[in-house]
Structure formats: structure tokens, C-alpha cells
């Protein structure tokens, strides 16, 4: 649940780009990490260190500011484990030189009614990754700036 790429991740990404990769998609920490453009032998490459949790989540609650009971791992209630991004990018190749011409991300969030099922308020578990645009206004207002900050300045957020 590390919100920034580790030095080893950056080194691996750099090695992949130096070996000719134009796009490196990393994943694993269950939270968003930055997307950056790197100079490459062919021009420009793109590295997305983590696009968040794209299948499920650990966070039982979505809004920030909840106290974490001592017996729980903080990730269990962290809203960041419900954030994700659908990356959309366009590359252009001109005379063998590569450049990123568009870099956008659709903010995603994971709807998870686990607590409703556990408390008898719902019969079936419903866990879905969906565009943040379909969430409540309060949720969008809280999570959109967090998602934008996590991905970094290179990415423009768009709605789906």
C-alpha cells in the first residue's frame, strides 16, 4: 500500500525503457502511483507505476477521515484502495522517434457493499469497478483531486 514508486521500481522502469519499451504498465501496491514520461532511446516513453485496484479493494469504507480500529490494518479502511484509473494514451512515431501525443485517465472507484451484506442491509455482495463519474457528488468531490494528485501532472483526467 505504498503510494509512491520505490527506487527499485524506478530503476526497473528505466531499464525497460532503455531496452526499448515505449510503455511500461506496473501494478501491485493496491493504490495509485504516478504516471511519468521518460526520455528514451527512441524519443519518449511512458511509465505508469500503478493504476490502482482494478478488480476489488480492501477498504471497507470509502470516505477519508474514519478512525482505524487498532486491530485492523489501515488498508482495510483506506479509501485509496478503492481508487483506480483507466489510462488512455496515444503515441506518434515520426522518422523512428516516439512521442506521447495524448495522456488521459478515467478516474475509477470500487463500489463494495460488503458492510451492507455483513449488517443484513443487502442480500448479495456487489463489488464493481466503475467510473468515478457515476459516484455521488460528495464522493467525486473527495476522490477526484486525490486521484489527480496520485497520477501526477502528466495526466489529464477525463470522464467516461
Residue spans for each PLM region:
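Short acidic, glycine-rich surface-loop motifs adjacent to enzyme active sites
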Residues: 1-4
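Conserved beta-sheet core of the metallophosphoesterase superfamily
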Residues: 7-85
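A short C-terminal boundary segment appended to hydrolase-like catalytic domains
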Residues: 60-160
